[in-house]
């Protein structure tokens, strides 16, 4: 998967910060994450024109990042 070998930030606060700074090229969100966490990220991604892709579970998203815990959000960073 593209996520593991890419430069990235993990976690909702870091993802929002990367999007607003203009350094995020794509955001991945877990479908099973709480809406109060994902909704603001989706809104800021729409505002800044960053694509969002949904991953089935927080655990799957964490594993795709090469970490052993779940995460709600990941942003791939521009080169």
Identify the function of each model-found stretch.
Residues 33-59:
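Feature captures the catalytic cores and cofactor-binding loops of soluble hydro-lyases/lyases
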